[in-house]
Amino acid sequence: IEILNVFKHKHNNINIFYLSKNKGVAFSRNLGIRLSKSKYISFLDSDDYWSPNKLKDQINFMEKSKKVFSYTDYTPFFLKNDKKIYKKSVIVPDLINHDQFINDTCIATSSMMIKRSFIGKIKFPKVILEDYAFKSKILKKGCIAANAGNNSTFYRITKDSLSSNKFRNIYWSWHINKKYNKLSFLGRIKSVLLISFNSLRKYGFK
């Protein structure tokens, strides 16, 4: 909150909305989308951070390319003795459609930007891996997401984000692919295996 207030004092177009209690990530993101009056929507998890020009550069890309969904490359990092340890940057493909995404969840939530009017009534469902479900539903509308061409997102790896939850994530990936992506039994097996493999390839076991 202190960091947000610093930015609010510098920019009069920033609004901060307080919740009386923690209602979860999905509720907060859906509320932000509903209250937003901007042309584009971006999300930044509290563990992650952006380079200073991330939003400006990405908006310029969206305006020039006329894309409704974009993302950036990103660099994973973790904390060791309060020091940031950076891993190899994840270079995301130039273009990603729905079929590609469900086999490799390579779009970091904190890296993406979506045209608000395109989101429409799509919401983050109140499930584990709500960001995977949301991005799947956006891409299923028929758009092709595009790489904005810069590495401006830094994604923090925590114990909760990877290995300690791998079995839970497999379960919810299976559930989302069945309910939202309407994949066949074999399609769900393929998706879960490829997502698991690509996650290990990008982040390792840390």
PLM region spans:
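Acidic donor-binding segment of Leloir-type glycosyltransferases
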Residues: 1-18
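Conserved donor NDP-sugar-binding/catalytic core segment of glycosyltransferases
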Residues: 53-85
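The conserved acidic donor/metal-binding loop of glycosyltransferases
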Residues: 45-49
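Short alpha-helix within the catalytic core of nucleotide-sugar-dependent glycosyltransferases
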Residues: 1, 30, 38, 51-63
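Glycine-rich, basic loop-to-helix element that forms the pyrophosphate-binding segment
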Residues: 18-36, 57
